[in-house]
Amino acid sequence: MNVKIKKLHNWDMTPTEAILLQRELAQKVSACGTLSSISLVAGADVWHSRTSGMGRAAVVVLSYPDMNLVEVSRSEGDCHIPYIPGLLSFREMPLLLSAFEGLESMPDLILMDGQGLAHPRRLGIASHLGLFLNKPVIGCAKSRLVGEYTPLADEAGSYSDLYHNSQLVGRVLRTRRGVNPLFISVGHKICLEEACSRVADCCRGYRLPEPLRHAHLAAAELI
C-alpha cells in the first residue's frame, strides 16, 4: 500500500458538528495548482444497496492519457450514517478511504463522483477526499447541488459557468452531444480550468469520463 491518508478527524459526530467541521475544513481547500505530468488517474464512486444499509466503494486506476485499466480496489460495509443533503461525505468517506488504502499505487489525479466546491459550505465529498489524501481531486457530479447557470449548447464540449451566491463554484460541461451535462468543480489542489480540461481528456464517447465510468461499474461489481 503506497497511499498515505491523513487523520483529519473521526466520524462520530452530530449533523450540527459535521456542518461546523465542513466550514472549518473548507478554509484548507486549495482551488489552484497545475499538474505538470500525469501517468495515473483514478475514478472513485460509491454504490448503495436499495434494500439494506450496505455500501461498496470502488477506486479504479487507469493509465493516462490512454485510459487502460491498471488497478481496481473495493471496500464494502454498512453505511451507518443516513443520507443527509450536504453531508454525503460523512456517509461515504470511510468506505472510500478504505478502498484507497487497498491501492498498490497512488494516482496523480482523482475524479470523484460528487461535488467539490459546488457545495453550500464549499466542502463537497471531492474536496473532503482531497484533504484526506493531499492529492488533486476533481468533483464530477451527475446532478446539481447548488448554483445557477445559463443554458449551454447541445454540442460536446459546450459549457456554462456555475455560480452560487455570486461566487464561481464550478462549470457545467456537456461531454457528449444530446446527453445531460456534468457538474465539474474543484475538489482540491487544481484550478477549475485544468479540472475541466482533464475531465474532457478522459472522455471516450460516453457521458462519464473513463475513470468514473469504470468506477461506477466496479462499485456495482459489473467489472
Swiss-Prot record:
Q: Which GO terms describe its molecular function?
A: deoxyribonuclease V activity; magnesium ion binding; RNA endonuclease activity, producing 5'-phosphomonoesters; single-stranded RNA binding
- Signal sequence extent: none
Q: Determine the domain of life of the protein's source.
A: Bacteria
Q: What is its main location?
A: cytoplasm
**Annotated NCBIfam families:** PRK11617.1 (NF008629)
Supply the gene name: nfi
Q: Which cofactor does it need?
A: Mg(2+)
* Species name: Dehalococcoides mccartyi (strain ATCC BAA-2100 / JCM 16839 / KCTC 5957 / BAV1)
Q: What is this protein called?
A: Endonuclease V
Catalytic activity as recorded in UniProt:
Endonucleolytic cleavage at apurinic or apyrimidinic sites to products with a 5'-phosphate
Q: Which GO terms describe its biological process?
A: DNA repair
